[in-house]
Structures are given as C-alpha cells and as structure tokens.
C-alpha cells in the first residue's frame, strides 16, 4: 500500500492546549506525510468512560489499537509489525486510541484488535500523544528500512 492509501487516525480524549506538545506533534505529523495520511481527532471528555467510548466508536475505522497500561508490552519493532502485517493483508485504515485522565472504557479496550503498552509507567495523556505519534513515525521508518530507528 502506498502512502496515499494508508490512513492513520490518532483518537485522543481531551484537548491539547500546550504549544510545546503541539509543536512536537506537528514535527512528527510533517515527517509522516511520505508514509501515510495522518490525522488527530480529539474527543471531548465525557461524564463517564462509557460516554467517551460511544463518541470514540463513531470515529473508529479499520484496525483498532488502544493504548492501555495493562496491554501487551510492545517494542518499537513489534509496533511496526502490527502495521506491516495488517497492510500486507490489505488493511489501509488504522485507529489508535488514547484515553483521558480516567483511562478508557473496558468494553472499548476488549473490542480493540490490539491492546498495547509502551511500559508499566503511567504517562500523562497529553505526553502519550507525543509518544504515540513518534512511535507511529518510528514504525513507518522501520517498515521502510530507514535509519531513524537504531
């Protein structure tokens, strides 16, 4: 699948306000352009995780990956492999979900194709966006045999 054919959506609960996070994400968004059509969708924090999950579900397309501290501890190579295996099967859309400060609804996590964790530490959900976008970029460079990942 070519860059124009792969769509990656990062769906995140809450609004990103800080310019320093926005700048970091913008840098990786620019770097991702040769590899995919990338977008971030912000979901308003709901009164409950169930309400947030309903709003998230409306945005999900293709392969669904949720970030969950209790998910499979994933290396950068394994994360890249998720994309690679699915793209080789013809999957062209990926939805990656980051919960808000209260996490994600359990049913939403169970329904995902992948539940992954980048470690046992808890990250602020705003920082997790930067980490996720960087790891998506890293995954694309691994798949394309570029030297970014060492």
Where are these regions (language model features)?
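N-terminal beta1-alpha1 ligand-phosphate binding loop
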Residues: 5-28, 32
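Conserved RecA-like P-loop NTPase ATPase core
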Residues: 10, 65, 99, 132
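Hydrophobic/aromatic beta-strand patches that form the interior of the parallel beta-sheet core
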Residues: 11, 41, 65, 114-116
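Short glycine-rich anion-binding loops that position phosphate/pyrophosphate groups of nucleotides
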Residues: 16, 69-72, 100-103
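Conserved strand-to-helix beginnings and helix N-cap segments that scaffold or border functional pockets
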Residues: 21-25, 53, 76-80, 109, ...
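S-adenosyl-L-methionine/SAH cofactor-binding core of RNA-modifying enzymes
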Residues: 35-94
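Short glycine-rich, acidic/polar surface loops and turns
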Residues: 94-107
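Structured adenosyl-cofactor binding patch, chiefly the S-adenosyl-L-methionine
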Residues: 106-150
């Amino acid at each position: 699948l070519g860059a124009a054919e792969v769509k990656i959506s990062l769906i995140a609960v809450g609004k990103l306000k800080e310019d320093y996070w926005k700048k970091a994400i913008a840098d990786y968004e620019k770097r991702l352009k040769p590899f995919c059509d990338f977008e971030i969708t912000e979901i308003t924090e709901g009164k409950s995780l169930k309400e947030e999950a309903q709003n998230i579900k409306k945005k999900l397309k293709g392969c669904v990956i949720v970030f969950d501290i209790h998910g499979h501890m994933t290396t950068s190579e394994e994360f890249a492999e998720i994309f690679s295996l699915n793209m080789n099967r013809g999957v062209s859309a990926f939805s990656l979900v980051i919960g808000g400060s209260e996490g994600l609804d359990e049913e939403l996590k169970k329904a995902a194709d992948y539940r992954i964790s980048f470690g046992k530490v808890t990250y602020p959900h705003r920082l997790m966006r930067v980490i996720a976008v960087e790891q998506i970029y890293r995954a694309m460079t691994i798949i394309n045999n570029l030297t970014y990942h060492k």
